[in-house]
Amino acid sequence: MTTKYIFVTGGVVSSLGKGIAAGSLAAILEARGLDVTILKLDPYINVDPGTMSPIQHGEVFVTDDGAETDLDLGHYERYIRTRMTARNNFTTGRVYSEVMAKERRGDYLGATIQVIPHITNEIQERIVAGGKGHDIAIVELGGTVGDIESQPFLEAIRQLGLKVGRDSVIYMHLTLLPYLKTAGEVKTKPTQHSVKELRSLGIQPDILVCRSEVNIPINERVKIALFCNVTEKSVILLRDVDSIYKIPALLKAQGLDEICVKRFGLDCPEADLSEWAQVVSEEANTSNEVIIGMVGKYTELPDAYKSVNEALKHGGLKNAASVKIKYIDSQDVEVRGVSILEGVDAILVPGGFGERGIEGKILAAQYARVNKIPYLGICLGMQVAIIEFARNVAGLKNAHSTEFEANCDQPVVGLITEWLDKTGEVEQRTENSDLGGTMRVGAQLCHLKKGSKVFDMYGTKEIFERHRHRYEVNNNLLPILEKAGLVVTGLSEDKKLVEIIEIPNHPWFVASQFHPEFTSTPRDGHPLFKGFIKSAIDHQQGRFE
């Protein structure tokens, strides 16, 4: 079957939840037996989000094939079974880089390079490549209609609609209906103007998804349909809800999926959303609440740890527990001491880069180890646990990472200079390599040690997990750490790199070099997060000795 396209644009304001809407629609269509993928087009000039500040952009989501992508791809993978790849996310910077590289090679035969047709053609080619092999490709365009940066993308999707035919394309526009409490009514004018702007660019939306705090009266729906040139049934209300996992059922109840399949002429069964009903039921029926202390560097923006936040919630769902995350700035631990960690049921130190707040993270790992509090370290969270153990248990008082102290005389963590990539080829890096695109990144094989906590949690001896790091445990000093009691329970494919460590004389102290949060989903959870939340419940209820 020829791929069908659903283009999702946004208007009025940013951060309306286009990614959630796209993911929810994809979940319904997948539940109807269709093969669905989702693309995210980002109008910013950066080649990818890999070197962008998490405070500005949120987390960098890593795919199996090692792409550093927008956090919306995390939403997509949590909603559908399709795994995202490098083809599912590209930016203006990536498009221009490729066009300029083609120009330098002479691919354009001396033509004058212009936004139309060269940039718009490149965008279309990437959209088609990303959707190839799937029944439906939902394409989310970042930003807001009217932004200068978005114009080449809007022109590209307009042209693509003409090329593939109107029966193979749907334009879905997400807008805001502000509710004025003083007047007691929703205002439709911003939506009308947003659609007017979109139509001025040659795109007539087929579906309007309207965000609102309240229900939309029928007369307002009629008005929106009339002034925006869509049918009344194509005006979909996306009301604020207390759980994003209720949205698939909310959209299905309004017939959004039926509009799409009829437009595309597809014959497919009704959607079975029983798995999502189960997720919503698990959220509503919890018997415990645990507090997880997340000690990090970017705590002022929770989206910097979006996948970790969601994975913790998923772990809670599978343990009938609601999870409350207490964000703790690691610098505050340095200034105020570990007393601010009191009262938490478990401690998590997530990934990060840079020296700021590093000693606070080390103190958090020490506090968890000494006080027998469940600890999960991720990436840098494993490295600080190694440093803390080396200093305070193994007797390496000057232990540190060369990331933070280049001339450290006891470097228990150092730069990886050589490793096997996802294809089995050897990759090499030096201290002089660029920051962008030079990490050990993507899914890697890990061997688990039988009898370990992680082996029991995963239930298998080999796993694949996603990485994003430059530094690793120094194997030259590893024997000293192991003699002091540290246990390596996970090794890389060639068994040269430490992937997981545990402290055996502790109720639950586990740290991984990889990022387990990237593969956690609300329907399945993740072994490490399920185990971590269970340990938090056990600690809270005094089940640990």
Swiss-Prot record:
Record-listed L-glutamine binding positions: G352, L380, G381, M382, Q383, E403, R470
GO MF term set: ATP binding; CTP synthase activity; glutaminase activity; identical protein binding; metal ion binding
Keywords: ATP-binding, Glutamine amidotransferase, Ligase, Magnesium, Metal-binding, Nucleotide-binding, Pyrimidine biosynthesis
Region (Amidoligase domain), start-end ranges: 1-266
Glutamine amidotransferase type-1 domain: residues covered: 291-542
Binding positions for Mg(2+) per the UniProt entry: D72, E140
Further facts: CTPSs have evolved a hybrid strategy for distinguishing between UTP and CTP. The overlapping regions of the product feedback inhibitory and substrate sites recognize a common feature in both compounds, the triphosphate moiety. To differentiate isosteric substrate and product pyrimidine rings, an additional pocket far from the expected kinase/ligase catalytic site, specifically recognizes the cytosine and ribose portions of the product inhibitor.
Purpose of the protein: Catalyzes the ATP-dependent amination of UTP to CTP with either L-glutamine or ammonia as the source of nitrogen. Regulates intracellular CTP levels through interactions with the four ribonucleotide triphosphates.
Stated name of the protein: CTP synthase
Organism: Psychromonas ingrahamii (strain DSM 17664 / CCUG 51855 / 37)
